[in-house]
């Protein structure tokens, strides 16, 4: 009896030990001879591909290479055995030709020329395929609209929305949030495709021949029939999907994670604010609060009863970072992009949480040990809850559009254009379908909108206009009163003109005033009639804020509990401003006193290092505080830096400016009381910018030897005496400077809130771990130690800090002198230091000796050129 052939391992249909005999009692023997089919001349070679117990008849085009045969084999695996496919299958298979005349039944196919007409080619899995290869199977994700409630199979939360709520895998049928696609492991089971695929053959005798219902196909036809091949094909594959398709995290990341040690989950009782299912049993977590358990590291959710059945496969917090870009298999529409971004932004992550703001500040060269050590007891630098994140909406909303006739005092020819009014300007288009426009009238340049008054420029033989738009450079006469005949062309008529006049007036008003309700039983008063209670500018009393400033409601610079900060413009000068709009109806008396305290303090201050207050407007419902608009804050600079921390040179530059501004405040007996990186604003996008202090809501008037006891400020930056409700003085600000300096150089907060601050300060190993403090100078650590003194009498003052050797450096002096040259004012350095630094430059061969002018900052930075270059690019993006 003939010897049974050895079946390839790892593919379906291969008989194993104890397998039942084939039906009918037939023994497995060598495949019987196949009846060759005669192809058309020049059409190619027809042969059979066998995978396990399945055979498919294929036609290989003439002059094809071995790569085509491998593609055909991969296509059959994807069609018949989707659960057995994996990433890189193309490179992990071998082709053997059955040769009954040879002692070795299977002959390795080395080229397409080895395959002859009617041959049987066996597909065998190579020994180079590892266990990890079988575990990595990318998902084929497409945007899907669900008709019934569905839950994400990654995070367990419900997929919200009416349409296009999430992503569905075409292979396994699992559902995911769009935001979760960044973290989905490549573990597609292919169960959905397996249900749709054909069954394998029962024995080797039932061979699919070239019938109409079978698969006699060419390489092109077989490739077209498989739509899921894209993530598994070599670069030569041309198959694509018509639908938007996405994949999860990169394959290389999965390979790295498979080699990591998996640890048990750390479950904590959690209260869920949205419907969530248990990721172990796939059942809903029921209840109003404390519904289940959540792993504090990987955010795995489960029932309390299911926690014991959850495997020890926690991969830690590093996976939930959202830093892996989602690859796109095909192009997708702008609507899909916006929907994806909206879903990502509305991810339910609490602002300031570790999952959103965790910084990876450790250098790669310090190794895994340094990273683990630096992350044990430290809180990463983050934006605290009281802070405001600067954001700008993508586009303005169209308030009104339509055809309008108009002329001006500079051109009396009456024209007709398609006007479009948004929150920032009036655009005059040639027609309603083109993007080409005739003119733009920014709302910030409109001084007044008046009823028709000047009829001296009305073109002869035409009707008078309806209203006038007055700017500093021109006056526009808009609309046309109807003549003797009713109706008329579009853009004419008193009714249309009144609609445009009302819309423009409303656009010129602050957005908050347009919907302010009037008190019951009272006639609605004119909300635009405002009075200025405090002013530092040449503006008369009892004027309308809309006549002085244009507030852009779509440019939100920040928001808080009681109001919103909008961008704006001064109408006459075009100067950018920031307008803090506060709702007095939601404003407690205590916070209102803080606001008035801030305004009163800022009114008395005039210093280049302190934000400038222009004026304050007030109505019965609202308060408008107008200040100069700056570029960003110091926290954004730290978070956007390459290593999550600032170089020493830049930190010296910024800390010196902060100390100079504090010296001016303390000279006037003003203590800021809420100093933190969020309240240190950048005046420009320069790599070495001017900084200004802002947010004086907690500021206090404290004499040189006076003390206060009221609770103020942000706890993360507050001195111990405030947290312990003890008396404090102006040295409170110096503690905050020490914390700012610490977080700037390290990217982490110096203290753990669960332990005593005094004990932490005395533990040098805890305060200054090797990563990253081994790369920071001893002078910086010494200054921080003198600022973070629990005893107030030992804490450095402003003048003592400015005289510290770490800040008294020639390079820092050069940087500050260049800034003063740009500002045209000397307020940081002093003339008495010039001779000392000139002598120092003569004795030490340092670049840039003498008074600096315009020079390249990067060229004068010996140790940290690469840091400053990367930081300059990020600051320009802010």
Swiss-Prot record:
Residues where Phosphoserine is found: 30, 197-198, 200, 203, 206, 212, 214, 244, 518, 706, 710, 876
Compositional bias ranges of the Low complexity kind: 1-12, 236-245
UniProt domain PH: residue ranges: 397-509
CC annotations in GO: cytoplasm; cytosol; Golgi apparatus; nucleoplasm; nucleus; plasma membrane
Positions carrying Phosphotyrosine: 87, 407, 438, 717
Active-site residues, record numbering mapped to chain: 674
Family statement drawn from the similarity comment of this UniProt entry: Belongs to the protein kinase superfamily. CAMK Ser/Thr protein kinase family. PKD subfamily.
Subunit structure: Interacts (via C-terminus) with LCK. Interacts (via N-terminal AP-rich region) with CIB1 isoform 2. Interacts (via N-terminus and zing-finger domain 1 and 2) with PRKCD in response to oxidative stress; the interaction is independent of PRKD2 tyrosine phosphorylation.
Stated role: Serine/threonine-protein kinase that converts transient diacylglycerol (DAG) signals into prolonged physiological effects downstream of PKC, and is involved in the regulation of cell proliferation via MAPK1/3 (ERK1/2) signaling, oxidative stress-induced NF-kappa-B activation, inhibition of HDAC7 transcriptional repression, signaling downstream of T-cell antigen receptor (TCR) and cytokine production, and plays a role in Golgi membrane trafficking, angiogenesis, secretory granule release and cell adhesion.
Name by which UniProt lists this protein: Serine/threonine-protein kinase D2
């Amino acid at each position: 009896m003939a010897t049974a052939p050895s079946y390839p391992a790892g593919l379906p249909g291969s008989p194993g030990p104890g397998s039942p005999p084939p039906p009918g009692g037939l023994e497995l023997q060598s495949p019987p001879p196949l009846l060759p089919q005669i192809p058309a001349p020049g059409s190619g070679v027809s042969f059979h591909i066998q995978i396990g117990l399945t055979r498919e008849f294929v036609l290989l085009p003439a002059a094809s290479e071995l790569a085509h045969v491998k593609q055909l084999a991969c296509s059959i695996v994807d069609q018949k055995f989707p659960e057995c496919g994996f990433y890189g299958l193309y490179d992990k298979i071998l082709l053997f030709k059955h040769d009954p005349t040879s002692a070795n039944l299977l002959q390795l196919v080395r080229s397409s020329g080895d395959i002859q007409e009617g041959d049987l080619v066996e597909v065998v899995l190579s020994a180079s395929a590892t266990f990890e290869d079988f575990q990595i199977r990318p998902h084929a994700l497409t945007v899907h609209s669900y008709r019934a409630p569905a839950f994400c199979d990654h995070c367990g939360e419900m997929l919200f929305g009416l349409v296009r709520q999430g992503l569905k895998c075409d292979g396994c049928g699992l559902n995911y949030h769009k935001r979760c696609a960044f973290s989905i492991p490549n573990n597609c089971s292919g169960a959905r495709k397996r249900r749709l695929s054909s069954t394998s053959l029962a024995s080797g005798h039932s061979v699919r021949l070239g019938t109409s219902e079978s698969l006699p196909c060419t390489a092109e036809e077989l490739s077209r029939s498989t739509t899921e091949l894209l993530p598994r094909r070599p670069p030569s594959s041309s198959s694509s999907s018509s639908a938007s398709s996405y994949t999860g995290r990169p394959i290389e990341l999965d390979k790295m994670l498979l080699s990591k040690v998996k640890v048990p989950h750390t479950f904590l009782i959690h209260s869920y604010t949205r419907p969530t299912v248990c990721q172990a049993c796939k059942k809903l977590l029921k209840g109003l609060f404390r519904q289940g358990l959540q792993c504090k590291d990987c955010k795995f959710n489960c029932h309390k009863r299911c926690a014991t059945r959850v495997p020890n496969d926690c991969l830690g917090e590093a996976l939930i970072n959202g830093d892996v870009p989602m690859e796109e298999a095909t192009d997708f529409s702008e609507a899909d992009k916006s929907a994806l971004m909206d879903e990502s932004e509305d991810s339910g992550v609490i602002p300031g949480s570790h999952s959103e703001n965790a910084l990876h500040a450790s250098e790669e060269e310090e190794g895994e040990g340094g990273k683990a050590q630096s992350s044990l007891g430290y809180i990463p630098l983050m934006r605290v809850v009281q802070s405001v994140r600067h954001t700008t909406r993508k586009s303005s909303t169209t308030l009104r559009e339509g055809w309008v006739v108009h002329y001006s005092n500079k051109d009396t020819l009456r024209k007709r254009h398609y006007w479009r009014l948004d929150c920032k300007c009036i655009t005059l288009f040639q027609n309603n379908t083109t993007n080409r426009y005739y003119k733009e009238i920014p709302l910030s340049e409109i001084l007044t909108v008046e009823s028709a008054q000047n009829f001296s420029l009305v073109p002869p033989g035409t009707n008078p206009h309806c209203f006038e738009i007055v700017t500093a450079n021109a006056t526009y006469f808009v609309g046309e009163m109807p003549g003797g005949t009713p109706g008329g062309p579009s853009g004419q008529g008193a009714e249309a003109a009144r609609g445009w006049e009302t819309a423009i007036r409303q656009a010129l008003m602050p957005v908050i005033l347009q919907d302010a309700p009037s008190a019951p039983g009272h006639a609605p008063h004119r909300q635009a009639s405002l009075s200025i209670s405090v002013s530092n500018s040449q503006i008369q009393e009892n004027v309308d804020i809309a006549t002085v400033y244009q507030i852009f409601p779509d440019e939100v610079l920040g928001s808080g509990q009681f109001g919103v900060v909008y961008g704006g413009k001064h109408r006459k000068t075009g100067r950018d401003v920031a307008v803090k709009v506060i709702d007095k109806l939601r404003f407690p008396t205590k916070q209102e006193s803080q606001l008035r305290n801030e305004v009163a303090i800022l009114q008395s201050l005039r210093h280049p290092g302190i934000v400038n207050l222009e004026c304050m407007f007030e109505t019965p419902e609202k308060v408008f505080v107008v200040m100069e608009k700056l570029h960003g804050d110091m926290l954004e600079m730290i978070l956007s830096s390459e290593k999550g921390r600032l170089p020493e040179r830049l930190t010296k530059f910024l800390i010196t400016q902060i100390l100079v501004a504090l010296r001016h405040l303390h000279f006037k007996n003003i203590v800021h009381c809420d100093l933190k990186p969020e309240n240190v604003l950048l005046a420009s996008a320069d790599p070495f910018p001017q900084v200004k202090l802002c947010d004086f809501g907690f500021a206090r008037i404290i004499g040189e030897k006076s003390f206060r006891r009221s609770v103020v400020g942000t706890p993360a930056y507050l001195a111990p005496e405030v947290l312990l409700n003890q008396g404090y003085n102006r040295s409170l600000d110096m503690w905050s400077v020490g914390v700012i300096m610490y977080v700037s150089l390290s990217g982490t907060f110096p203290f753990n809130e669960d332990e005593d601050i005094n004990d932490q300060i005395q533990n040098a190993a805890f305060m200054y771990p090797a990563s990253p403090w081994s790369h920071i100078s001893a002078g910086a650590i010494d200054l921080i130690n003198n600022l973070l003194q629990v005893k107030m009498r030992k804490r450095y003052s402003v003048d003592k800090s400015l005289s510290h050797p770490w800040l008294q450096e020639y390079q820092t002096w050069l940087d500050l002198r260049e800034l003063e040259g740009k500002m045209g004012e000397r307020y940081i350095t002093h003339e008495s230091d010039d001779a000392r630094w000139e002598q120092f430059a003569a004795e030490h061969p340092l670049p840039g000796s003498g008074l600096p002018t315009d020079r390249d900052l990067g060229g004068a930075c010996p140790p940290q050129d690469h840091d400053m270059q990367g930081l300059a690019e990020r600051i320009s993006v802010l």
